Design a protein with these regions (language model features):
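Structured, contiguous alpha/beta core segments that scaffold functional sites
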Residues: 2-285, 289-291, 295-302
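Surface-exposed loop-to-helix/strand elements on domain peripheries
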Residues: 225-243, 263-372
């Protein structure tokens, strides 16, 4: 049972009638087990090995991913959104202080326009989707836009129409939100479900998992002051009792780890000490983390140098960093500005403000520093 509510009901918690969603979906809502919902992950579209990622989530908590998303979000916010109209000469004219442009500077009482724009970019790249809920007054005028958590929103459709409404899960209940009351921003299309966008991060979850594992390994070694695991065995045929073995183990740990690292260890009896684990030098953990950084930055379209990732810093100079920022702006940000501007035009401007296609919302990036 899906509860049908007005937007004011969703925001302010009023109760209304319920309505059951009916109809056949144009595309199935629950395709073969999602890569994000699975306990294991394989290489994208392959069957090459399984990795347990039950605690990894969608990858956004990874530090390399966060560095790239921060750069994307902050850089995207540098451009300003204008509402334009095409005049009789076919030229675009900016409409000063258009209500939509003013709204997007402060979409709701709690968030600035920059914060909401960063949400859009992060949501599109992490989950493939970002959603803005429209709040309207009694006269039907748009007065606020609220971002929704992408993982809590499910687009629904019928056999005849791709998307008819959205289900928003909050507080253990599912709310029905009409399609016209949400602006849905997609990054491409999910090849298994055209109602949703496509997340580039899902193709590198394996690498993200590897990066997290390498970090955990480095932390474990460092917490032991860089001393790898060892096996202690007696040289003579008479071994220690279980109690003696436990005491030897505790004594070894106390003498060679933590603040006691480097102190001499004196043991009774002849003993062999064999190293079982690799040292940080043997593992070359820095190299293990380089490949994930390279692939994460590649699928997100962010040069590693600009994100401050180690994979790019060793080749960084002031000159090539400046060239890469221009490359990043022209090949990543400008297409994003055009994509988001078109969605704002179609889903907000023409639905809630203007009824003529002569109007459009577009980002002005003429003052973006990287293009000067």
């Amino acid at each position: 049972m899906v509860e049908k509510r007005k937007i004011s009901d969703v925001i302010f918690g009023k109760q209304t009638e319920t309505k059951r969603s009916t109809g056949y979906n144009f595309f199935r809502d629950d395709p073969a087990e999602s890569v994000f919902g699975s306990q294991f992950i394989q290489g994208y579209n392959t069957s090459a090995g399984n990795w347990n990622v039950s605690g990894l989530g969608n990858g956004e908590s990874n530090s390399a991913v966060t560095a790239c998303l921060q750069l994307l979000g902050l850089s995207f916010s540098e451009a300003t959104l204008d509402v334009c109209a095409i005049n009789s000469d076919g030229q675009k004219e900016i409409i000063p202080n258009h209500p939509l442009a003013l709204l997007l500077r402060r979409p709701n009482p709690f968030m600035s326009g920059d914060v909401v724009q960063q949400y859009l970019i992060n949501g599109m790249h992490v989950s493939g989707n970002a959603y803005l809920l429209k709040q309207k007054n009694e006269a039907g005028q748009l007065v606020a836009l609220y971002p929704l958590m992408p993982e809590d929103v499910t687009p629904k459709g019928t056999k005849e129409e791709l998307i008819t409404h959205y289900e928003y899960e909050t507080g253990g209940e599912k709310l029905y939100i009409d399609q016209k009351d949400i602006a849905h921003f997609k990054l491409g299309l999910d090849p298994k479900n055209y109602k949703k966008g496509y997340s580039p991060l899902k193709t590198v979850l394996r690498e993200i998992f590897g990066d997290e594992s390498a970090g955990q390994m480095a932390t474990a070694l460092l917490s032991n002051m860089g001393v790898p695991s060892v096996m202690i065995t007696p040289k003579d045929e008479f071994g220690p009792t279980p109690e003696e073995a436990e005491q030897i183990s505790k004594s070894y740990q106390q003498k060679v780890s933590g603040k006691n690292k480097g102190k001499p260890l004196v043991m009774s009896g002849a003993m062999n000490i064999e190293k079982l684990a690799f040292s940080p030098k043997d593992l070359d953990i820095g190299l293990l983390r380089q490949v994930p950084e390279e692939r994460i930055s590649a699928v997100l379209g962010v040069p590693a140098i600009l994100a401050g990732l180690g994979a790019g810093l060793k080749h960084a100079t002031y000159s090539n960093a400046r060239e890469l920022r221009e490359f990043f702006t022209e090949n990543k940000l400008i297409p994003l500005w055009r994509m988001v501007g078109e969605e704002i035009t179609q889903q907000i401007l023409l639905k809630d403000y203007e009824d003529s296609t002569l109007y459009q919302a577009e980002y002005d990036f003429s003052d973006v520093r990287a293009l000067q």
